[in-house]
A protein has these predicted regions:
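Short coil turns that delineate tetratricopeptide repeat
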Residues: 351, 408, 450, 488, ...
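Single-residue signature of alpha-solenoid repeat helices
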Residues: 339, 396, 438, 476, ...
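Active-site nucleotide-donor binding segment shared across nucleotidyl transfer reactions
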Residues: 16-49, 53, 58-59, 208
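Conserved catalytic core of two-metal-ion nucleotidyltransferases
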Residues: 1-22, 62-236, 243-301, 305, ...
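Start-of-helix register in tetratricopeptide repeats
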Residues: 321, 378, 412, 420, ...
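Register position in tetratricopeptide repeats
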Residues: 389, 431, 465-469, 503, ...
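Canonical tetratricopeptide repeat
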Residues: 416, 424, 458, 496, ...
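Residue-level recognition of tetratricopeptide repeat
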Residues: 328, 385, 427, 461, ...
Length: 759
């Protein structure tokens, strides 16, 4: 957990306690809800906490806030504090600094936050929702100057101007109250739905999707989650929500976070240089321009989409004609690998946000105005079936919904859509532990689609539940074996195979299979199940490893840790001993050097992901120290060199230099002493002093690794310096640069001698 996540967890636990004590409802939402199910805590890269709260509960929380909020905490919402610049409320730490873009010229609290997305009751009549949505967009435009909201819904610019006129001449409070009276006029007991109070996209939910709440674990805290959790996650993220996205697709949120000061101190520093009036005027003109041009821009985007659609269809037709088999034949053969290849470009275009949209800020217009590529019903059916058979059920369902809206919807497409909805019903039954109903629902689906991975995985859950209870274990084994015949590289089924081996007492074989399973799945649920099963054995494993190292059984220790590093790559103790063991058993100097390079890269990567947070990278210290020792650095000097990797403060760096000087170092190790002092000086920015120490290290007749390191330093510096000198020479006189650069080496003769020694 990052430091930011620890702070957010503290804030959330405070809010959770207040809600439970005062019978206030909320549910975990968005990525936080995924974290509850997939990680039982934060998604590793998540940097916020989202909850939903019904409007009546939020209003009650506001009423009691004066007596229940801890020190340095506040509730923010625009209907209470008109200086607040967002449409949804927040629980904020006022003694911290986390400034979002919309707060740049505001006066509201800008600390670390919990987003509380209010759920406003909405009648069943869609016209009432459209009325709410229109006024919510205008409300958002007036509250938040940074973002243009209404253009995506083509809100008339005249409507915005009418309310802007009221805002300007009748006042902010009076105008916003008029809008609030319209938007919040519906009563909870009269409405079957909620709209999420967010200008970005006011999602609609059935009330029974959210309440009554259920309870699940989040970072060892029992939290409220939506009543139909699986339905919510499927609706919001698709059927593939449990899969961990590639690194580049992981979303985070932008905020200027400054440790050690409050948001007031930051604002006092930059606000005097900002022309607030000009920013507000520019913002208003940008909104007017965007709203006025929204329809034109959407028409242009539609025309661009049509051109791309035509070229994509032509490409698809060419691919189909080049295939040795027709689409119908490939479907009958269930050759979905070949079909997926044929449809690759079609999917890239048709499934993009620009064509079918997404229920998010950027994709909402296309979501309500999708563009379908004109292909035959046979082609469309084959494409949708391929999506189902390649674990993209959510995308297939979305496409089928869009196709149905066109009015041309053949029976096989209707059947496929109905079957996907049956599958989702079975998943919902399973969530509520109605196992028999879920299994009965799946039975006809398994007959019609015997090799759909998602369906096979779901059925395997029933069989494994029974096997864990000692019922029909043979049936489970046969089914998992058949599943692995169909999907030999799927870690989901490998994990079950390992579990069955473990039940039979074949633990060593099971661990090997678990390791393969870990490497062959990005399913977060499977990863979590492996973690929960294996983590209790991690501590005993590292103890065994240490015992093996103590008695000199290094190969046995390495074999043990290589396996467990595959099993628990994120377990800190396992990772620490894996690298320590590698440093202990390396047989060649090149292996130790390679290991050091690998560790340093990991440290740099982890620092880049969590700047300023060094908790996780501490686990590499022992391995680095052992590696330096293996390369000839005495114990204390090896520790100094390791500490240098983790140190950047000026006082700490000077202390490291003193430790290197004062260490009880044997005479033959003086080269290493000067080398380490040189490294410290270089990190301090004292280049000349650093190279003086490097030259002295070379004079001490250092041999082996230290001489290799020094040679690399000198030759690299000369190579890079010569390139810079050439640049200076082209621009004019390079003599000043050459004198400064080469001065640290001495005379030309000394430089020539140094090069000979390095080579």
């Amino acid at each position: 957990m990052t430091e930011k996540q620890e702070h957010l967890l503290q804030l959330f636990r405070e809010l959770d306690e207040i809600c439970k004590k005062n019978n206030l409802r909320y549910v975990m939402a968005g990525g936080t809800a995924i974290g509850v199910v997939r990680n039982e805590g934060f998604i590793p890269w998540d940097d916020d906490v989202d909850i939903y709260m019904p409007r009546d509960d939020w209003n009650k929380l506001v009423e009691i806030s004066g007596s229940v909020l801890p020190e340095h905490r506040a509730l923010q919402c625009v209907d209470v504090d008109r200086s607040y610049t967002n449409t949804f409320p927040r629980y904020v730490a006022t003694d911290s600094c986390a400034l979002h873009k919309h707060q740049i010229i505001g006066r509201d609290s800008a600390g670390e936050i919990i987003d509380v997305l209010t759920l406003d009751p909405i009648p069943a009549d869609d016209k009432e929702y459209e009325k709410y949505r229109t006024h919510m967009m205008i409300y958002s435009e007036l509250v938040n100057m940074v973002v243009v909201y209404g253009a995506r819904w083509e809100i008339p610019v005249t409507a915005y101007l009418r309310w802007l006129f009221s805002y300007t001449f009748l006042g902010k409070d009076r105008t916003l109250k008029k809008l609030e009276k319209i938007m919040y006029s519906y009563k909870e007991e009269d409405c079957p739905r909620y709209a999420m109070r967010w200008g970005g996209c006011p999602f609609l939910f059935d009330k029974d999707m959210m309440f009554p709440v259920k309870y699940m674990n989040f970072e060892n805290t029992e939290v409220m989650v939506p009543h139909r959790m699986s339905d919510y996650l499927i609706w919001h993220y698709g059927d593939e929500w449990s899969y961990i996205p590639p690194h580049g697709e992981r979303e985070s949120h932008d905020a200027v976070t400054v440790e050690g000061i409050t948001y007031k101190e930051l604002r006092d520093d930059y606000l005097p240089g900002i022309r607030k009036g000009r920013l507000r005027r520019d913002s208003i003109w940008r909104k007017i321009y965007s709203l006025a041009g929204a329809k034109r821009n959407h028409r242009l985007q539609y025309k661009r989409n049509l051109l791309l659609a035509k070229s994509t269809v032509m490409d698809l037709e060419a691919r189909i004609s080049e295939s040795r088999h027709s689409l119908k034949e490939l479907v009958e053969k269930r050759d979905f690998s070949q079909l997926n290849e044929i449809f690759t470009k079609y999917y890239q275009v048709q499934l993009s946000s620009a064509f079918i949209g997404r229920e998010d800020f950027g994709g909402i217009y296309a979501f309500y105005h999708p563009v379908l590529l004109e292909v035959s019903d046979v082609t469309f059916y084959a494409a949708m079936l391929t999506l189902v058979y390649t674990e993209r059920i959510g995308k297939a369902w979305r496409m089928l919904v869009v196709k149905e809206q066109t009015g041309t919807f053949p029976s096989e497409l209707a059947q496929l859509k109905s079957d996907i909805e049956l599958f989702r019903r079975a998943v919902c039954d399973y969530e509520f532990k109605r196992y028999q109903e879920a299994e009965d629902t799946m039975a006809p689906l398994m007959e019609r689609y015997p090799e759909v991975p998602g369906f096979v995985k779901f059925k395997s859950r029933f069989l494994m539940e029974r096997a864990r209870n000692g019922i029909d274990m043979v049936e489970a084994e046969l089914y998992i074996d058949e599943a692995l015949r169909l999907f030999p590289e799927d870690g989901y089924f490998l994990k079950y195979q390992g579990e069955l081996l473990w039940m039979k007492g074949k633990c060593a074989d099971a661990l090997e299979v678990f390791a393969d399973a870990r490497e062959k799945t990005n399913n977060g649920i499977t990863q979590l199940e492996l973690d929960k099963f294996l983590n209790p054995y991690g501590r005993e494993t590292v103890k065994t490893c240490q015992q093996l190292l103590d008695v000199g059984q290094k190969d046995g220790a390495m074999k043990l840790m290589a396996l467990w590093y595959r099993l628990l790559p994120e377990n800190p103790s396992v990772r620490e001993y894996y690298y320590l063991t590698r440093a202990s058993v390396a047989k060649k100097r090149s292996e130790v050097e390679e290991l050091i390079g690998e560790i340093l890269k990991r440290i740099d990567a982890e620092r880049a992901e969590s700047p300023g947070e060094n908790n996780d990278i501490q686990i590499y210290k022992r391995a680095l120290t052992k590696a330096w020792e293996r390369l000839g650095y005495p114990g204390e000097l090896a520790r100094v060199r390791t500490d240098l990797v983790y140190t950047s403060e000026a006082d700490d760096l000077e202390w490291l230099a003193e430790r290197a000087k004062d260490g009880q170092i044997r005479k033959e190790k003086r080269a290493q002493v000067y080398k380490v002092i040189g490294d410290v000086r270089r990190k301090q920015g004292q280049t000349e002093a650093a190279f003086q120490n490097y030259l002295e290290a070379l004079r001490q007749n250092g041999s082996g690794f230290v001489r290799t390191e020094l040679s690399r330093i000198f030759l690299t510096d000369m190579y890079e310096g010569s390139k810079r000198a050439a640049v200076y020479a082209k621009a004019g006189d390079a003599s000043e640069f050459l004198n400064q650069w080469l001065g640290k080496y001495g005379s030309i003769e000394e430089i020539q001698q140094l090069v000979k020694e390095c080579l």
